[in-house]
């Protein structure tokens, strides 16, 4: 499961994890036993950022070759606020659309999710 977080007013929240690359990424995680994809999204967003989810929309599914799994992509509108980061998140920030596009690495699921979210919402 992977989530692109937006405040609905043009800002996107991205995180940089302590254990991964130095790049900014979308919130993502694995579904636990007896958990729906939506419950996983809510849990991961709360755990990694401390942000409150206001709305969630399924966008698409994506194959993630690194772990040989299928990721379900969501666009989540969250309440813009201060981050409360987990131990696995080094830093997080709010970024405008163009900056967020630049920060997400080319060829990643996060970049694809952003592209597809924009297409579904305003035809770009």
Locate each region found by the language model:
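N-terminal strand-loop-strand
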Residues: 1-26
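Solvent-exposed, well-ordered amphipathic alpha-helical segments
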Residues: 7-11, 41-42, 119
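Unchanged
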Residues: 31-116
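Charged phosphate-binding loop/patch that engages nucleotide di/tri-phosphates or the phosphate backbone
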Residues: 116, 120-124
